[in-house]
Amino acid sequence: MFDVVTIGSATLDVFIESDSANIVSVSSKDKRSDFMSFPYGSKVEIDDFSRNLGGGGINTAMNFAHLGLKTSTVVKLGADEISPVIYQKLVESNIDTSNIIKSKEGLTGFSIILVSFQGDRTVLAHRGVNSSIKEKDVDFENIKSKWIYVA
């Protein structure tokens, strides 16, 4: 019996910081919009990058596990090189992996998060197999839990 089972998405998030990004403001009569820009067709140096697990199902599972709760997660992983990275991190974080849905094709969710010099973020997201989780994919008989958290 688990304390909590999370259901949601799984992604690998890559955070990229570059002071080369320009913030461009465009105003119209009714509003102003800010855009992050880089010189078109150029190679842009980055100042730093990191990768972290992301997605609502993973983020909440990690937080519950850090609080000491017996945790499992229902997420869908693709048939790619990202899938084992996420799987191993869940194991290391003491999160049960028996409810993970392993796709035989498709890509795991992936995001590139561009961080401006002001700290604002622009996210380029590929949902991958997260967008194809179906009720029939989930083994509800295996989900014995006090709580279920749908992210």
Predicted regions, residues:
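Glycine-rich phosphate/adenosyl-contacting loop at the front of the ribokinase-like
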Residues: 1-72
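Conserved phosphate-binding/catalytic loop of the ribokinase/pfkB sugar-kinase fold
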Residues: 98-103, 113-151
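A glycine-rich helix N-cap at a beta->alpha junction
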Residues: 89-106
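Short secondary-structure boundary/capping elements
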Residues: 52-59, 82, 104-105, 130-135
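Alpha-helical transmembrane segments within multi-pass membrane transporters and channels
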Residues: 76-78
